[in-house]
From Swiss-Prot:
It is an enzyme of class 7 (translocase). Signal peptide: none annotated. It is a multi-pass membrane protein. The chain crosses the membrane at residues 16-34, 41-66, 73-105, 129-152, 156-183, 191-223, 233-256. It comes from Tragelaphus oryx. This is Cytochrome c oxidase subunit 3. Keywords: Membrane, Mitochondrion, Mitochondrion inner membrane, Translocase, Transmembrane, Transmembrane helix. Component of the cytochrome c oxidase, the last enzyme in the mitochondrial electron transport chain which drives oxidative phosphorylation. The respiratory chain contains 3 multisubunit complexes succinate dehydrogenase (complex II, CII), ubiquinol-cytochrome c oxidoreductase (cytochrome b-c1 complex, complex III, CIII) and cytochrome c oxidase (complex IV, CIV), that cooperate to transfer electrons derived from NADH and succinate to molecular oxygen, creating an electrochemical gradient over the inner membrane that drives transmembrane transport and the ATP synthase.
């Protein structure tokens, strides 16, 4: 910041947006190859490229914000607006899935047997694993709030404990969801019910994995004393994202698991 007469961060040229876009392309084609030809080579390459991009991009941002002091209050304000707009875009993303579900379920066509769930589909019991998943995510919402309050009050160890509990609950949710998918009596190819169910809950599961990764990074950063009560936007963004994931799950549970069954 020595020869700078403004509070904005002039970012150095970075290769990570390019490698990130490449990894997204590889993962998309990899998913198609896996679905149609049962080959996971391209998908694994895409995931590896994505992991490397995430690691190196996060490393650069941590260096610029924590060690070089580029994240001034003005920059943080811009980041906050960016995160809010990103979450709004995600809301619209999930709106499309809910639209597809309600479009199909509110007026089932004769091909579906004129009823919902369609003839031949045995839906999952909403009072079994889905209800446990709901409790797990609601508990994680409480623990992330505990972590935030602990950080604001300077209780570092309490914050680490709460963050660890949140991550553990996120991983537990993912394992429960995976076991539910494995044991489900229908598949993604079982008509509109299977496709809307697996795409909506699958994308939510992906967001839980992303949120858990975000929180794991925050956990290791807190171990290295990167956050203070006044400078912790990385953690705040992760907490906002986690609450968003919580709320989306409540809508999924009420719409697809409970009402849809």
């Amino acid at each position: 910041m020595t020869h700078q007469t403004h509070a904005y961060h002039m970012v150095n040229p970075s290769p990570w947006p390019l490698t990130g876009a490449l990894s997204a392309l590889l993962m998309t084609f990899g998913l198609i190859m896996w679905f149609h030809f049962n080959s996971t080579a391209l998908l694994m390459l895409g995931l590896t490229t994505n992991m490397l991009t995430m690691y190196q991009w996060w490393r650069d941002i941590i260096r610029e914000s924590t060690f070089q002091g580029h994240h001034t209050p003005v920059v943080q304000k811009g980041l906050r607006y960016g995160m809010i707009l990103f979450i709004i875009s995600e809301v619209l993303f999930f709106t499309g899935f809910f639209w597809a579900f309600y479009h199909s379920s509110l007026a089932p066509t004769p091909e579906l047997g004129g009823c919902w769930p369609p003839t031949g589909i045995h839906p999952l019991n909403p009072l079994e694993v889905p209800l446990l998943n709901t409790s797990v995510l609601l508990a994680s919402g409480v623990s992330i709030t505990w972590a935030h309050h602990s950080l604001m009050e300077g209780h570092r160890n309490h914050m680490l404990q709460a963050l660890f509990i949140t991550i553990a609950l996120g991983v537990y949710f993912t394992l429960l969801q995976a076991s539910e998918y494995y044991e489900a009596p229908f598949t993604i190819s079982d008509g509109v019910y299977g496709s809307t169910f697996f795409v909506a809950t699958g994308f939510h599961g992906l967001h839980v994995i992303i949120g858990s990764t975000f929180l794991i990074v925050c956990f290791f950063r807190q171990l290295k004393f990167h956050f203070t009560s006044s400078h912790h936007f990385g953690f705040e963004a992760a907490a906002w994202y986690w609450h968003f994931v919580d709320v989306v799950w409540l809508f999924l549970y009420v719409s697809i698991y409970w009402w849809g069954s």
